[in-house]
């Protein structure tokens, strides 16, 4: 029955490890431009990282840019400007790919992970029976294990992140006092993240004690969808004014610095949850 090629009888011969785990793909691209003259130097870098997991529906992408310029804009005046930014996107099913249960905050990540459900799945069960994904019952529990349903029917987790950093500085070396430098500098950092988690309950056909039985997914979500959304942002502004003096007198070195710093940091978090 397991080899007759007809899974409708409730028997099959499926390698669930091969069904779940495929070949992942990682690609990374970078473009760099740099150059300048005797008094000005510039640098720019653009990068992309894309990852497709060896389990379906696990994807990650990241774009990053970095640029800076250093210039002597006038005699004894120096100026620098830097910019960096990152944009990232992550998409996964509602179940984790693997992990342990050590952190109670994230729930039973290892116990119900797709990897754990895969090794619990019986190869003689067809992928679907009576129109539903099949499941085996984890030993000493009542939890149905169905890795394919966990991948394709459990919902999703989406996370998008954006960060930006800008810094600038200007300095002036006083020509009539050797080693005395006045400097103004500032930086601005900003970041935000957005996440959306959708849990969609699903039914399974589990096989236990010689009979098929319709069961709910192991999360026990009931009949309604659960949707959670959240966003957060943070920003920090730093300004500095300094006077430095560096000089040598014979075998003695003198290094003095007076610095004033102003800092302002803010953040905000917002989340919402709804159940159908």
Task: List the predicted regions and their residue ranges.
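Surface-exposed loop/interface segments of Gram-negative outer-membrane beta-barrel transport/assembly proteins
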Residues: 1-12, 53-60, 64, 68-163, ...
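Outer-membrane beta-barrel channels and translocator barrels
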Residues: 26, 37-38, 72-74, 173-177, ...
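Short, charged helix-to-loop "capping" segments that act as catalytic/coupling loops
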Residues: 166-183
């Amino acid at each position: 029955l397991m080899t007759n090629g007809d899974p409708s009888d409730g028997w099959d011969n499926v390698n669930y490890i091969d069904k779940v785990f495929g070949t992942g793909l990682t690609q990374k691209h970078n473009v760099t431009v740099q150059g300048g003259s005797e008094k000005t130097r510039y640098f720019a870098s653009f990068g992309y990282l894309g990852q497709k997991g060896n389990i379906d529906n696990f994807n990650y992408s990241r774009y990053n840019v970095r640029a800076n310029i250093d210039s002597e804009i006038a005699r004894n005046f120096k100026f620098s400007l830097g910019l960096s930014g990152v944009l990232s996107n992550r998409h996964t099913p509602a179940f984790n790919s693997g992990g342990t249960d050590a952190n109670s905050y994230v729930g039973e990540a290892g116990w119900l992970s797709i990897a754990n459900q895969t090794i619990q799945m019986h190869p003689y069960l067809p992928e679907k029976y009576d129109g539903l994904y099949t499941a085996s019952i984890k030993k000493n529990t009542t939890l149905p294990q169905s890795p394919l349903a966990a991948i394709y029917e459990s919902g999703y987790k989406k996370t998008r992140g954006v960060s930006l950093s800008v810094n600038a500085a200007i300095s002036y070396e006083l020509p009539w006092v050797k080693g005395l430098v006045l400097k103004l500098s500032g930086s601005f950092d900003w970041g935000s993240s957005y996440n959306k988690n959708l849990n969609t309950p699903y039914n399974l056909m589990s096989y236990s004690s010689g009979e098929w039985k319709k069961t709910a997914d192991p999360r026990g979500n009931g009949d309604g969808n659960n949707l959670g959304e959240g966003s957060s942002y943070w920003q920090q502004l730093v300004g500095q004014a300094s006077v430095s003096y560096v000089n040598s007198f014979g075998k003695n070195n003198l290094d003095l610095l007076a610095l004033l710093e102003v800092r302002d940091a803010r953040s905000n978090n917002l989340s919402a949850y709804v159940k159908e």
